[in-house]
Amino acid sequence: MAGLLLIIAVSVAALTPSGRAQIDELLTNLQSPLWLEDPANLERILLLPPVLVTLILVFVVLAPIIEELAKLIPVALMSYRLPALGQALVWGLASGAGFALVENLFNTLLAVDIWAVVMLLRIGGSTMHALGAGLTAMGWQSFLRNRRPWKLLGAYIVAVTLHAVWNGAVVGIAGISLLATGTTAGPAQFITGAGALILLVLLVLLTVGLIAAIVFVTYRVRAVEDTRSSQATT
């Protein structure tokens, strides 16, 4: 993943006016072992405008679109049984949780030493994946039964939006963390610290909201299925 991002970033940088000179300088520096051992050099590369734009496009735009589709694949493969709404929700939640587990094992984009922040990212990210996949799975179930694509499209858009907001906040924290390492005490450090705090508060609120949304959706689906069951028996 890191290699792919580097290739994309270099390709984008080559299109900028000064991109060729920056690439030549980077290739020269990569041949120096001392330059490679200095973490500040990697931070400077990540903060280059072409690299930042590439990271935002990949993690905030492309990743949500692709991953929300990928999480629907297991549900679609099992849909030959034409699941009920509650069953589709459970399948979606399980697909999202499984995806989050794999992502947590291999995701090394943001290395954080604070245990509470790590737990927030893991719990919030897993909840986001589960809710998004659950909503999309219910949209898929509605499409199979009623042949109306609008609910599926709407659920997919909601899932992608939630995913993009979460990833945007995480990428923002990563960028602010890199900026903070190169700033000295003063207004600049205060601004970066305040920005990181605001994004952390946003992630906390998102996590609480995502958990509440899963509880609410589960309750509503159960109520709908109970109503249908009572109508079928009368």
Predicted regions mapped to residue ranges:
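Hydrophobic alpha-helical segments at protein termini of multi-pass membrane proteins
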Residues: 1-234
